[in-house]
Amino acid sequence: MNFTLLFSVFVTISLVSIIFSVSMSLYLDIYDSDWYGLLSKNNTNVYSQEKIFLLGSSTVYSVNSTLVNYHFITNEMNYEFFNLADMSDSPKKRILSLQNIISNEPKIVVYGLDIGNFRIETQDPLSLNDILLHPKNFFLYQFEDIMQPIRDKIPGSPKDRTLLTAKYFLFGPQPHHHPFLNFYETSVTPISEIKNNNQFDIEIQKLDLSENSKQVTSLKNIITEFKKNNIKLILFTAPKLIQEVSDDDKQLFEQTLMYYSNEYDIPVYFLHDRYVDMEIWRDSQHVAINSNTQVYTDDILEILLMEMK
């Protein structure tokens, strides 16, 4: 492949990726929990209930908003629960739409933190000899450096998110209480099968929990902004069947969150290892969605009820 063709491919992919990235970020930036769409018969929320937002990545999307809201309705509690989980979410990404979340005026925000979000991003720099002897590698290296931030913002299928944005304008968030990820029933995969399939793919990653970490800085800014706007924040660690970090780093992560809990006076709950012996998993990263896997939803509801007293 000559350099002219390689450069053309590079420019084309970059432009398309940027367009998709902007369009998909737009959905997060304009989200309105009271919006029902241009073609919907429901133009507004009839009831003035206090809003509860659940934030996090796909590791929290299986928390069932319908079950939580059913509990609130049957117990005559004036709350409405929204699962705003988004693919590949992290504090660094979520802070970009933070002001829009605040403008929706939630009473409570529950934030599920994925330990993997705080891993060290490593990329070995090319030496001068490599650049001189293999200029194509340098070009590809720069391409990777440009593309990675774009990938971080693309939550899965660009086609799906583009359609989701169009549906948002016409019909409002679908489903209304679970707007950013498709919510559908998934089957349980036996733990033995999951571990068998992942035994050669597990790579232990180091965490960066220093004050210089962009994820840590973003998390602290999120905490500060919610406190400034009198929004109650509850943190919890999102569950995974297989954690790709060492036990020492896992312990350090817990200690760091406990430090923030004391420093900012916010509750923290640890669920990251809570379900590792339960047959409730779709894969190594996600709890399945069906009537036999509701323990995750039940625990989030229990946390809410404790913190709402």
Task: Please identify what each model-predicted range represents.
Residues 59-145:
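Membrane-embedded segments
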Residues 248-309:
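C-terminal regions of proteins
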Residues 54-55, 112, 236:
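Short hydrophobic segments within beta-strands
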Residues 1-15:
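N-terminal Sec-pathway targeting helices
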Residues 83-85, 237, 270-272:
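Residue-level recognition of beta-strand->loop/alpha-helix junctions
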Residues 113, 126-229:
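Secreted/periplasmic serine-hydrolase-like ester/acetyl group-modifying domain
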Residues 14-79, 86-97:
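Membrane/wall-proximal cationic-aromatic binding patches
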Residues 220-247:
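Active-site segments of SGNH/GDSL-like serine hydrolases
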